[in-house]
Each structure stands twice: as C-alpha cells, then as structure tokens.
C-alpha cells in the first residue's frame, strides 16, 4: 500500500524485498531491492538487505559487493559488517571474515550475549601455537554447524581446542572433529 501511495518510496521497496526473501521469493526480493537502491542510491540498509538476498541465492561475490557498498555508505552499520563476515567466511576468506565478525557484538541481537572470561580473548594476531583455545556457541544449532567448518582453520594453529556447543550436537561434532574436545553447554 505504501508504494501505491508513494511510488518512489525506496524504504518500502527495501522492506518488500525483505518480505519476499522471508517468503522464499528470492527473484522478487532482488527486483524490489534493486528498485530501492535505484530510487535511493545512498540507502545503506537497502544494500545490506540486497546482500542478504544475494547470499540466500548463493551469489556470495555479489553479496560481498552489496555489503561493502552498504558499509561504504554507513561505516557503522553493524549488521552489514556481520553479514559481510558470513559471506567472506563462506568463501574461505577467513582473516577478513573474522575481522568483520567482530561487529556482531554491536548488533542489537547480540548486545546481551557476550560472555566474559578471565582468560584473554584471542585477537587472531596472537599466535595459537602451543596454546589452548576455548570456542563457545553463541547462536543456534544451524549456525553452530555452519561455523564448525572453521574449526579446521583453528585446529591447525592451536595445540588444543575445546568447543562448547548445544548438547544435541556433541556426538556429531565429536565424530567430525576427533582432535577437538567437544562439551555440551
């Protein structure tokens, strides 16, 4: 209805794109998203939304470009950084992906999830050679499975790796990563 009242309402097209994406109508979602960015080329959130749609279509390179455009327009858009990290990590660009992933703590959904430990947090600049690293699940089961693909990157560097995850994933992850100590949350 918003678009019928104001055909040049870029935000409405961006929201329509999100709705189509959530309904699994990815072709319609990308059309709406592109309409939004054509109407308002400086709309950072629209480019971030477009990146999400492209990522759902499996078009990771295009998604990365959309997220980078979003970040260029609004360098503090935490969700764009977080989503860029997912695309980069899924492409195997671990260093850049992990750098962007730090932005997740600045997103609304993660502000209260940060856990504080006495041990120092690994900053990826410090060598893990001869050290133990503790990794904990901070998201759902699907994300834990997706992120487990990064364990091989970590285990090649650390002496010992401990993974805390959802109880139902313990048997699967123990079988998949016999060199990782897997514990239930």
Regions found by a protein language model. Give the residues of each.
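Alpha-helical solenoid repeat scaffolds of the TPR/TPR-like class and their adjacent stem/linker regions
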Residues: 1-185
């Amino acid at each position: 209805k918003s678009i019928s009242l104001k055909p040049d309402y870029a935000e409405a097209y961006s929201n329509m794109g999100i709705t189509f994406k959530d309904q699994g109508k990815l072709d319609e979602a990308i059309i709406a998203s592109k309409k939004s960015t054509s109407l308002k080329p400086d709309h950072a959130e629209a480019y971030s939304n477009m990146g999400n749609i492209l990522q759902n279509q499996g078009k990771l390179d295009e998604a990365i470009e959309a997220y980078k455009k979003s970040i260029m327009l609004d360098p503090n858009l935490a969700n764009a950084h977080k989503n860029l990290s997912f695309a980069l990590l899924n492409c195997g660009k671990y260093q850049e992906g992990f750098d962007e992933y730090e932005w997740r703590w600045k997103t609304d959904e993660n502000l209260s999830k940060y856990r504080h430990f006495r041990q120092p947090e690994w900053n990826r600049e410090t060598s893990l050679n001869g050290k133990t690293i503790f990794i904990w699940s901070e998201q759902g089961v699907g994300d834990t499975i997706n992120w487990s693909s990064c364990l091989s990157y970590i285990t090649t560097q650390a002496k010992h790796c401990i993974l805390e995850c959802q109880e139902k994933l313990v048997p699967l992850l123990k079988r998949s990563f016999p060199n990782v100590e897997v514990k239930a949350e």
